[in-house]
Amino acid sequence: MNRIVSLLILVLLAFTLNAQQFELRELLDGNNPFALRADEFVPKHKFFRWLSADREGARYAAFKNPVKLTFLGFPVLEAILYFENNQLSKLYLSLYNRGDAGEIDYGKFETLVARFNEALSRQTGEKGTEQRGRLANNMVLYANFRVSDDILYTVKWSASGHLKRDMKPQYLQFEMEPFNPKDDPRKQSLVRVDRTKIETSKDLAANVRRKADGTVWIDNIPMVDQGAKGYCVAAVLERILKYYGIDGVNQHTLAQIMKMRSGGVTSEMMLDALDKGGSKFGIKAKNRYSAEIETVEDLSKLISKYNNLARRAKKKKIAQVQKGNIIFVGQTMAQMDPKLFRKLRCDGYSRAMNSFRRDIQSRVNAGLPVGWCVFLGLVNEKQKTLQLAGAHMRLIIGYNAADDSIVYTDTWGSGHEFKTMSLEDAWVMTMRTIYINPRPAR
């Protein structure tokens, strides 16, 4: 009896373990893996989530996911299946990225890259063609392209550093899509985009939509989910690039160029990186407005203005929060009375607020989103947010002049594509606005 019970326990345990693992290759085996249907796949595989309500893609994230996804036996951190006309059009896998997995030894990274390429060669019967390109100083991107049975298999990996002992692995990613001989990546630059593919002004303006209630917004901006890491800046930039027709650059490459850590990066660092390398991506960035606190002097000025207003309103003054040599901006601002800070922003900067309103309307009418850097926690947001306080970056994609509101979107996946708030609330939390414009071929 005890033996039977033990056997049953082992069977149940084996079943449980198997149920918690999924080998993606098995799903894609067959004569035509791109016959996979979106309406059948996601309902059967609940560990994937739609990227957006448009269902242009389904995403798997390993973080806090009970199902462990593998491909050719290698653990997958993130998987995205892209669909067109309800059929699979592209598969993307992140096998390593430092934002999700943290830092690993460079020797281990080299071994991982070699083992994965060997496994893919066995699977496809092709060794592939390897390329390399310079992203920025001490940043080299490598790629291996394999073509087998009219399918393009792309492996990309990169590390940053000058000497081998200093090298920091950045990412290892894989893509699979139908091969198009007229768009062969083996004959193109690995790090510089083809500007003939960038959308024209006329194309972008065609994405503008209008509702009967006066809402004007930009449609067709692809969703990117930053995941649990602080990659909002990189994810916002990836969305803009994809919207402009630039599809070969993702948030991990952008995070590498901006020297981003899992906790994030400042918008100033993004502007600096794009000033140096934006031409490679076919874009140009411009700082339009800034109230961002970047120096001790900036914070001191804000405290002084707030305290002057607090004195007149007979409210409690605030002081800079400092522990040792570290100044805590968030904790300092958390002391402010929300109503008083709103008055400071709206009355003290009314001309800038009016310019903010005009800029949004002008850019949205042209089909151009606004990069929007905010400080969360200053306004009680009515719609779902996954971050309660602190610096964050979003996109403003619309407005309604009738009720003086804006339309915005977050890089948190489905449910965050289309949100609204009053322009006054938006202005209160605004720290910076950035214009990122396309540079199509002439």
Describe the predicted segments one by one.
Residues 309-321, 326-407:
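Active-site-adjacent substructure of cysteine-protease-like catalytic cores
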Residues 41, 161-329:
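Active-site-adjacent structural segments surrounding the nucleophilic cysteine of cysteine proteases
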Residues 70, 75-77, 94-100, 137-193:
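An acidic-aromatic pocket/loop used at catalytic or ligand-binding sites
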Residues 58-139:
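Long, charged/polar, surface-exposed segments that mediate recognition or autoinhibition
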Residues 14-16:
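N-terminal signal peptide c-region/cleavage motif recognized by signal peptidases
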Residues 21-56, 108-131:
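Amphipathic alpha-helical segments
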Residues 2-10:
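Sec-dependent signal peptide recognition
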Residues 169-213, 365, 377-388, 397-442:
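Noncatalytic regulatory segments and standalone regulatory/sensor domains
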